Regions:
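Gly/Thr-rich phosphate-binding beta-strand-loop-beta motif of the actin/hexokinase/Hsp70
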Residues: 1-2, 10, 17-19, 35, ...
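Helical "lid/coupling" subdomains associated with nucleotide-phosphate turnover
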Residues: 63, 81-115, 124, 128-206, ...
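Acidic, polar low-complexity linker/tail segments
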Residues: 77-78
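Ser/Thr/Pro/Gly-rich low-complexity, intrinsically disordered segments
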Residues: 14-16, 30
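Intrinsic disorder
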Residues: 28-31, 42
Length: 498
């Protein structure tokens, strides 16, 4: 098995303006049908310089370059900093440390931006599902964390614009924009200095899975009947209407926490048999951490301090049955255009890019080469049936995540096939990718394209990108996105392995 060292964990975003900052510039280049918060845009007069993003699986990052002379902006490269750490929501009990945790990544990011451009380089802090969960559980702790990180970032030489807690719909829509922008399926910047629309190109759908939530976004064949699930973009004179929905608590880490909690609840003894763990695997744990997750609604037992023993049985059939119990499929009985949990969804169609934990799981299982569904299913089941010692021996250095690949693989199949409604025929349209167009896929780039109005909403009368001025040419931005690891992350770190 390949060594998979990066995992997208629970991601953590309403824009908080810093004192004294006003709105600058015309309206944003695109907006949702349920509008995003009002975007800032600076009076840019910047020469090209590197910019950076931080996020994806704790505090991880990438740098981007917006370089295209004085006549446009073209994403050109990326680089990941060496620092990594847990998401800011993990500092709920000590918010000050959330700010301090950013220092290493911030210092490295400063080296990517020329010193002369520091004060002119905008920086944003974004947060998604992990912080959404913390806000539900304890809003005051979430506010304290945002205050702490804002203090630290506000003292940076960069131009910190503020922080935002992104709604699930915005997260999904931003991921869709990222993919289709870097693939050149929305607009392209030509060598002649023009924004041009691709001919007869169909946008691809986006399947994103973090640690706390999962998102599906695509252009359906027919009209979107539930307007609360519709996002509308206007890019370079063309309007796009996409279906998008985010399922909170259906990200990988929270799924694993909910699954384990159900097994603990149904076990008559302190010995919990886990069908998704390999035979021969065992671990002891305190169940208290399970009930700290806002995604777990079960009543805690009176003896929370009593340790439990979890023993793997390596039974993929029983594992699938347990995973199905996390979904409410009966709520869609008799209803057309319904996924699960009573959520409206039109039929899937076209190509899809599956990224984040979709990719990381299938990359580990060597299933990212567009294998047919029968092969994928057989491979996952065979892996689940391997003894733990064999799995350990074939994948050294993977102890932290190794026991969960079976559950993650079967969960992805259940979600895609029984949840979203992919079939053997439509399965071939799913591609599992970490990157698109040489750029790591995620919501952050799409979010910043909207925030900075980098892509024009309308076709200029001159037909040239120069008409947008230097703001569209030299946009240099820096965005901080922070990923929370709740519940299951604590279990991952505290449990002994084997």
């Amino acid at each position: 098995m390949p060594d998979t060292t990066k995992h997208s964990s629970a991601k953590e975003l309403n824009l908080t303006l810093l004192p004294g900052r006003g709105l600058v510039g015309p309206p944003p280049a695109f907006a949702l049908a349920k509008p995003w918060v009002t975007r800032l845009r600076p009076a840019l007069n910047l020469s090209p310089a590197p910019s950076f993003l931080l996020g994806e699986g704790g505090v991880r990052g990438q740098s981007l370059s917006s370089l295209k002379g004085q006549v446009g902006a073209q994403l050109r490269g990326h680089r990941s900093p060496s620092g990594a750490g847990p998401g800011i929501s993990s500092y709920a009990s000590n918010p000050a440390q959330a700010g301090e945790s950013l220092q290493g990544c911030l210092e490295e990011a400063l080296t990517l931006v020329p010193k002369a451009r520091h004060q002119e380089t905008p920086m944003f802090l974004g947060a998604t599902a992990g912080m959404r969960l913390l806000s539900q559980k304890n809003s005051s702790q979430a506010e304290d964390i945002f205050a702490a990180v804002s203090r630290v970032l506000g003292q940076s030489p960069l131009d910190f614009w503020g922080a935002e807690l992104l709604a699930g719909q915005d997260e999904g829509a931003s991921g869709w924009v990222t993919i289709n922008y870097v693939l050149g399926l929305l607009v392209k910047y030509s060598f002649s200095g023009e924004w041009v629309q691709p001919l007869e190109e169909t946008p691809v759908g986006a399947l994103d899975m973090g640690g706390a939530s999962t998102q599906i976004t695509f252009v359906p064949e027919g009209p979107i009947l539930d307007k609360s699930t519709q996002a509308t973009f206007r890019l370079y004179g063309s309007e796009y209407s996409v279906y998008t929905h985010s399922y909170l608590c259906f990200g990988r880490d929270q799924m694993l926490t909910r699954l384990l909690t159900r097994l603990v609840q149904s076990s008559p003894t302190p010995l919990v048999r886990h069908p998704c763990y390999h035979s021969g695997y065992w671990a002891t744990l305190s169940p208290a951490a399970l009930y700290e997750s806002p995604c777990v609604h079960a009543t805690p037992p009176p003896d929370l301090d009593q340790n439990l023993t979890v023993e793997g049985t390596g039974n993929p059939g029983a594992c699938v049955s347990a995973i199905r119990g996390l979904f409410n499929f009966s709520s869609c009985q008799g209803r057309g255009h319904c996924a699960f949990d009573g959520v409206y969804q039109p039929p899937v169609q076209g190509r899809f890019y599956a990224f984040s934990n979709f990719y990381y799981t299938f990359h580990f299982l060597n299933l990212t080469s567009k294998q047919p569904l029968a092969t994928v299913n057989a491979t996952v089941w065979e892996f689940c049936q391997r003894p733990w010692k064999q799995v350990e021996a074939s994948s050294p250095g993977q102890d932290r995540w190794l026991r969960d690949y079976c559950a993650s693989g079967l969960y992805i199949l259940t979600l895609l096939l029984e949840g979203y409604g992919f079939s053997e025929e439509t399965w071939s349209g799913i591609e599992f990718h970490k990157q698109a167009g040489g750029t790591d896929i995620g919501w952050t780039l799409g979010y910043m394209l909207n925030l900075t109005s980098m892509i024009p909403a309308e076709v200029p009368t001159q037909g040239r990108a120069e008409s947008y001025g230097v703001w569209a040419a030299g946009v240099v931005f820096a965005a901080l996105t922070l990923v929370a690891t709740l519940g299951a992350a604590a279990v991952h770190l505290l449990w002994p392995q084997g």
